[in-house]
């Protein structure tokens, strides 16, 4: 298999990055890496995931330019306990098996909670998804964010101004 997948994914080995689970080299993180991250506690509480949990890196702002702050874009995960909501919407909630990228339990990727976090919130590297494991996450985000060109507002002369 080629080290670069159809969605631009490259394994850590292909990038020359060691696979140490110790403190991650935040400079070397890339889409498809699974990290342990500390998500902020929200006051007042909402529906967002919070606390210490695994997350999949899905975006590196430095690919577009120099960001104001050192952040990464991630999809938080939760433990798969056979929740019906995830079974009803598998494209929105891709599942990963126990052991995938060193996950301790079967997990659900919460695409509806994609967000930026400060790089200092990344507390450890767990592993890297292969292209087949990352594909449902990539495709789901692409469709959800209308990256395929669907649902993009047409420019009118009023809005062009």
Task: Tell me the role of every PLM-derived stretch.
Residues 1-161:
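Conserved functional hotspots at enzyme active or ligand-binding sites that engage polyanionic ligands
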């Amino acid at each position: 298999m080629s080290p670069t997948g159809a969605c631009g994914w490259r394994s850590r080995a292909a990038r020359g990055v060691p696979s140490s689970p110790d403190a991650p080299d935040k400079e070397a993180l890339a889409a498809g890496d699974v990290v342990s991250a500390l998500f902020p506690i929200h006051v007042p509480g909402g529906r967002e995931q919070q606390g210490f949990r695994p997350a999949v890196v899905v975006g590196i702002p430095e690919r577009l330019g120099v960001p104001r702050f050192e952040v990464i874009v991630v999809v938080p995960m939760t433990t798969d306990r056979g929740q019906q909501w995830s079974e009803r919407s598998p494209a929105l909630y891709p599942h990963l098996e126990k052991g995938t990228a060193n996950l301790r339990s079967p997990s659900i990727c919460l695409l509806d909670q994609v967000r930026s976090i400060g790089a200092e919130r990344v507390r450890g590297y767990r592993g890297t998804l292969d292209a087949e494991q990352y594909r449902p996450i990539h495709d789901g985000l692409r469709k959800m964010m209308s990256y395929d060109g669907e649902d993009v507002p047409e420019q009118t002369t009023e809005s062009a101004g």
